[in-house]
Every structure is written in C-alpha cells, then in structure tokens.
Amino acid sequence: MIEPTQVMLQTTVGQQADAQALARLAVQGAWAACVHVEPIQSVYRWQGEVREDAEWRLSFKTTQERLPALLEALKAHHPYELPAFYTLSATPLTPQWAQWVQDAVDPSS
C-alpha cells in the first residue's frame, strides 16, 4: 500500500483573479504540485444572516511536509477576513503520481 503522505487543502475566495493568484503563488513557491480552481455556489451564515454567493474553490495538492508552509502562505495572502482552510487526506493509488507530487513540492528542485 502506498503511504498517505499527500493531502488536499481546500479554501474558497470570491473572485476568480484572487483564486488564480493564490494558485500561482502556491505552485511557484513549490508548496503545491497542482491547484484545481472551480466556480461554486455557497450558502452560509455570516454575521447573523444566511447568504448565498458565487465563489471559487481551490484544491491544493501537496504533501504533509509542505502543508504548514502552504497554509502560512495562503493565510498571508487570502483576501477573506475569516478564510476557511481544511484538508482531505489523499492516498495516491499509483506510485508514479505520488512521486510527481513529491518532486513538484521539493524546494531543492
């Protein structure tokens, strides 16, 4: 079995330009191997009101080792007052893909 060393960190932003900027920052900084950027519709409670807004979901593919640096970079550049960050464990099903993620986030590469 392949070790579950990969994680997917997700967050949302309100503007496509912000999503693209965070995605590029993460990949250029070698904190994420890849980022999926998707338009979504969110329904949530904020300051006592139920709101519905278009947002952009970002799914960052990274490793356990690079996760702390990725999170710090995103917190420093996220446009929201209270951004949501959460992770999903990712167990790669092929060693080739696992190695690609590992190589892509290796700061010495």
Predicted regions and their residues:
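Positively charged, small/polar-rich N-terminal and surface patches that mediate targeting and assembly
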Residues: 1-109
